[in-house]
Design a protein with these regions (language model features):
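Residue-level signature of outer-membrane beta-barrel architecture
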Residues: 97-101, 139, 143, 155, ...
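Repeated loop/turn-to-beta-strand initiation elements of outer-membrane beta-barrel proteins
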Residues: 107-109, 148-151, 201-204, 258-261, ...
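Outer-membrane beta-barrel "beta-signal"
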Residues: 314-326
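Sec-dependent signal peptide cleavage junction
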Residues: 37-68
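Extracellular loop and loop/strand-boundary signature of outer-membrane beta-barrel proteins
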Residues: 79-85, 121-127, 173-180, 229-237, ...
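Outer-membrane pore/translocation modules
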Residues: 129-242
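Transmembrane beta-strands of outer-membrane beta-barrel pores
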Residues: 71-77, 115-121, 157-163, 198, ...
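Membrane-embedded beta-strand positions of outer-membrane beta-barrel proteins
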Residues: 67-69, 111, 153-155, 192, ...
Length: 326
């Protein structure tokens, strides 16, 4: 009989003849084995947790978050004032936040969110009216080629928050008609190209291949007259899409120790039609810091877009208010 068979028989005999003792040894061995296994698993879990925390901490370091929130309140009151005047109340909220990301693989992701929302009331009027209403999101994802230049893909989104109205008087009463709302219009622009960035104070994006879409609620276009358009969208339609090129940028500079100016601009060239027309937008924000919490700001916003209106649009806001820096 082979030796391995004899060995198996002997083992069986020993187990049968000393069953209680060997069962205790077997149980003890199993307890020691599984205790060691659990300890090893706990060490692996602790190591995994530590690696995950290190990764999360590193990702947090890759993000840079900064911005400003400003509240502005204006009020005027007149009584028996010979030269005249109207009582008024105006409130304005301005938010401008940046979220930037850079990792070791040289991927760059820059994001900017801007919100400006204000309302005003004049004595004698039946309705509050908008002083400002604007939401804009910019995002650029890029891969570094060298110190300053990157391959890029960008996204731009613009809309309003509150409904827009046309005010008129009929039969001696003030009336209003809704002419726009949130996401109507909504303007989306996408593009591929090159991104030049020296630092957070200056960048430029060139996109020879860009697409732009204007989206509206069909309720505003279904009753249009023949040839009439709503933000460039024809009767019964809900969008208009074009292909072109874009050039956009941002620059921040100090005029004095407590005065800074932000310049943002965007040019869009349409390849499909109206090639000679260039849509452009320029936004200048001058900030005067009085102290840590009080500041004044002057916003000058120019825009020309043939699809929206065939005239130069001008928006100007000045305010003194409370600032929260983040």
């Amino acid at each position: 009989m082979p030796s391995n068979t004899v060995f198996q028989i002997n083992i069986l005999i020993l187990i049968k003849s000393n069953k209680p003792k060997h069962m205790k040894i077997l149980k003890l061995f199993m307890v020691i084995y599984f205790s060691g296994l659990n300890a090893q698993q706990e060490q692996e879990i602790d190591s995994l947790k530590a690696d995950t925390l290190d990764l999360l901490n590193q990702e947090k370091k890759n993000f840079k978050f900064f911005g400003v929130t400003q509240f502005t309140f204006n009020q005027a009151y007149f009584e028996n004032w010979v030269s005249g005047g109207e009582n008024s109340v105006t409130g304005l909220l301005t938010i401008d936040y940046n979220i930037n990301y850079l990792n070791k693989l040289k991927w760059v992701w820059d994001n900017n969110i801007m919100l400006s929302l204000g309302t005003t009331y004049l004595s004698g009027n039946s309705f509050f009216k908008k002083a400002d209403d604007r939401l804009e999101i910019n995002s650029v994802l890029s891969k570094k080629v060298n110190t300053y230049w990157n391959y890029s893909a960008y996204f731009n989104f613009k809309t309003q928050i509150l409904p827009g109205y046309r005010f008129y008087t009929e039969d001696g009463e003030d009336r209003k008609e809704e002419v726009s709302q949130i996401f109507s219009p909504a303007i989306i622009q996408l593009g591929l190209g090159w991104y030049y960035k020296e630092n957070d104070l200056a960048w430029f994006n060139i996109s020879p291949l860009a697409a732009r879409g204007i989206f509206v609620n069909k309720n505003y276009t279904q009753n249009l007259s023949t040839g009439e358009k709503y933000f460039g969208v024809e009767r019964g339609a809900s969008s208009i899409v074009s292909v072109g090129a874009s050039f956009s940028g941002f620059m921040r500079s100090k005029l004095m120790e407590n005065i800074s100016i932000d310049n943002k601009f965007n040019f869009y060239f349409n390849y499909l039609y109206k090639i000679k027309n260039i849509d452009f937008e320029w936004n200048a924000n001058i900030r005067l810091k009085v102290n840590e919490k009080i500041s004044a700001s002057l916003i000058v916003h120019l825009q020309y877009d043939d699809d929206l209106i065939k005239r130069l649009q001008i928006r100007e806001l000045f305010g003194l208010g409370l600032v929260i820096d983040i």
